[in-house]
């Protein structure tokens, strides 16, 4: 998965993308509802000279959760401290982070659903009362001391919101669902990024890159850089529609934004399991991927694009999936699925 051109996760090659990130809400493209709400909440907090209420961003990876955390810190004129659920192993780790914050700072915890439950409980008074409870001593001699914390904002990010405990989820004042971007929004992101990279690109080429980016800005920027490389070598450096298509075809990212692994999943359901239903564990074993990887990385896009459907009995290929491979689905009298070449 790490070598996939269309993986939504951050990879080593994406470091250049940090310079492409917008720093204000005005520059931010997409997520209109989230953006509109944040704009109001930030302005209201600044008007009252208060810290912003705690925010939870949830949705598939690569949709801008970290970028929005940076923007919130900038808008609130605070510092951003970044960590992740798995990185906070001990209560002392979290206590050290919390006591290092100042007013209006933003603490961003990625993969917050992976926080240890005992560590999570330390966050409860920190989020509600801006206080940290520390236990000194052991046994009968133990006593609790409460330390006041600065007025900070906690921003949590998760791809698995259902795994968050209710007590933690309920302490967030704002819950923001991150959605896949439209092709038009991704085109605008590609145009903006190309300008920052000093690359000339026509809007048709930018749209083609956006269309194949699986609704994800991180992928769009990654594909833009690879198309830039191709056009630097094969063309005069400018990116036109022909060059973009040739580069993307060479990268084996098809017109629907699917790569080899996506097609492998669809082929397995259609040709090996007669269109489904097939259980997720069986499917994961068959294609050699982790169950969580399929559920978190591949499925959201395939479902969003209408290629597969979730049912109580398992995953089922849609008519669109059959059309993608140029075959038709015919329901026989015994309800078995047969496949005929067109």
Swiss-Prot record:
Catalytic reaction annotation: ATP + H2O = ADP + phosphate + H(+)
Region described as Head domain (RuvB-H)? 255-342
Keyword hit for DNA repair:
yes
Q: What is its EC number?
A: 3.6.4.-
Which subcellular locations apply to this protein? Answer: Cytoplasm
Q: Which domain of life is it from?
A: Bacteria
A GO molecular-function annotation: four-way junction DNA binding
Q: What are the binding positions for ATP in this chain?
A: 20-21, 62, 65-67, 128-130, 171, 181, 218
Give binding positions for Mg(2+). Answer: 66
For this record, the Gene Ontology CC terms, alphabetical, are: cytoplasm; Holliday junction resolvase complex
Which Pfam families does UniProt cross-reference here?
AAA_lid_4 (PF17864), RuvB_C (PF05491), RuvB_N (PF05496)
A single GO BP term for this record reads:
DNA recombination
UniProtKB keywords: ATP-binding, Cytoplasm, DNA damage, DNA recombination, DNA repair, DNA-binding, Hydrolase, Nucleotide-binding
Say yes or no: keyword Aminoacyl-tRNA synthetase present. Answer: no
| Residue ranges of the region described as Small ATPAse domain (RuvB-S) | 182-252
**Positions with a binding annotation for DNA:** 310, 315
> Know anything about its domains from the record?
Has 3 domains, the large (RuvB-L) and small ATPase (RuvB-S) domains and the C-terminal head (RuvB-H) domain. The head domain binds DNA, while the ATPase domains jointly bind ATP, ADP or are empty depending on the state of the subunit in the translocation cycle. During a single DNA translocation step the structure of each domain remains the same, but their relative positions change.
Which family is this sequence assigned to?
Belongs to the RuvB family.
Protein task: The RuvA-RuvB-RuvC complex processes Holliday junction (HJ) DNA during genetic recombination and DNA repair, while the RuvA-RuvB complex plays an important role in the rescue of blocked DNA replication forks via replication fork reversal (RFR). RuvA specifically binds to HJ cruciform DNA, conferring on it an open structure. The RuvB hexamer acts as an ATP-dependent pump, pulling dsDNA into and through the RuvAB complex. RuvB forms 2 homohexamers on either side of HJ DNA bound by 1 or 2 RuvA tetramers; 4 subunits per hexamer contact DNA at a time.
Summarize the subunit comment: Homohexamer. Forms an RuvA(8)-RuvB(12)-Holliday junction (HJ) complex. HJ DNA is sandwiched between 2 RuvA tetramers; dsDNA enters through RuvA and exits via RuvB. An RuvB hexamer assembles on each DNA strand where it exits the tetramer. Each RuvB hexamer is contacted by two RuvA subunits (via domain III) on 2 adjacent RuvB subunits; this complex drives branch migration. In the full resolvosome a probable DNA-RuvA(4)-RuvB(12)-RuvC(2) complex forms which resolves the HJ.
* The name this protein goes by in its record: Holliday junction branch migration complex subunit RuvB
Q: What is the species listed in this Swiss-Prot or TrEMBL entry?
A: Clostridium botulinum (strain Loch Maree / Type A3)
């Amino acid at each position: 998965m790490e070598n996939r051109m269309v993986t939504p996760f951050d990879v080593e090659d994406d470091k250049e993308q940090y310079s492409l990130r917008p720093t204000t809400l005005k520059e931010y493209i997409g997520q209109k509802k989230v953006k509109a709400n944040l704009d109001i909440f930030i302005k209201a907090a600044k008007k009252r000279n208060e810290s912003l209420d705690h925010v939870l961003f949830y949705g598939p990876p690569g949709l801008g959760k970290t970028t929005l955390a940076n923007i919130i810190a900038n808008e609130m004129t605070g510092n951003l401290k970044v960590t992740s659920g798995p990185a906070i192993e001990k209560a002392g780790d979290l206590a050290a982070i919390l006591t290092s914050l100042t007013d209006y700072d933003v603490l961003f915890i990625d993969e917050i659903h992976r926080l240890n439950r005992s560590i999570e409980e330390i966050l409860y008074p920190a989020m509600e009362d801006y206080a940290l409870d520390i236990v000194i001593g052991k046994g009968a001699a133990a006593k609790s001391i409460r330390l006041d914390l600065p007025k900070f904002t906690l921003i949590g990010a998760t791809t698995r919101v259902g795994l968050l405990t209710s007590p933690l989820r309920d302490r967030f004042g704002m819950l923001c669902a991150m959605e896949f971007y439209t092709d038009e929004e991704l085109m605008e992101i590609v145009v903006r990024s190309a300008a920052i990279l000093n690359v000339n690109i026509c809007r048709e080429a930018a749209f083609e890159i956006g269309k194949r980016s699986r609704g994800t800005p991180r992928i769009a920027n990654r594909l833009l850089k690879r198309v830039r490389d191709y056009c630097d070598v094969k063309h005069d450096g400018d990116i036109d529609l022909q060059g973009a298509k040739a580069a993307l075809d060479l990268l084996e990212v098809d017109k629907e934004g699917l790569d080899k692994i996506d097609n492998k999943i669809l082929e397995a359901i259609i040709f090996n399991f007669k269109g489904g239903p097939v259980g997720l564990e069986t499917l994961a074993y068959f294609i050699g991927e982790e169950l969580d990887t399929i559920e978190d990385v591949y499925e959201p896009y395939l479902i969003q694009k209408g290629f597969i459907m979730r049912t109580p009995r398992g995953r089922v290929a849609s008519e669109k999936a059959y059309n993608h491979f140029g075959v038709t689905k015919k329901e026989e009298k015994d309800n078995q699925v047969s496949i005929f070449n067109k």
